[in-house]
Amino acid sequence: CVSGENGGPVANRFQVASAITSSSYVSHHTAFEYYGIIDQVFYEVYVGSEARFRDFEFDGYTYHYIKSQLKEGIESPEFGGGVRITDKERTIVDSIKDINLIAGLEEVLSCIVAVNGIDESKMLKYLSVYDSAFLYQKTGFIFSEYQTDLSISDEFIKICKEKSGNS
């Protein structure tokens, strides 16, 4: 990962994050950056992994461990140079789940409304695996507020409301 020519890093922050452990992948806010949904560069890199690692700094970025709770929704984009990353729908669900830990409501909302072509079936699959009434409630509320902008079906909102129970 270090150039013999000038001692600088050869790999980008997404490649570094994907190589920290055998199960590591780019997640949350950093995944939105990878997909070009956020124009601003942040110096915090969020890394999901089954194996724990200590947060560390490398080349001006701080890499933060996020406990991996799902195996679903992680992909290796073609021509990605070894990058492993959550797909857009998993990134949305994870960001809503951890809304107060990483980016905050305003930032997460601006990312969600910038995503094109959200696959509702993937969203429901990830919500089902997390199996959290509160996560269904938060997701249903956010998506009902932006239903028209995001072209979200009434059925998706209905399922979120049904699964949110009394939380």
Model feature map: region roles:
Residues 1-72:
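Short gly/ser-rich loop at a beta-strand->alpha-helix junction or flexible surface loop bordering the NTP-binding
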Residues 76-167:
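Hydrophobic alpha-helical interaction segments
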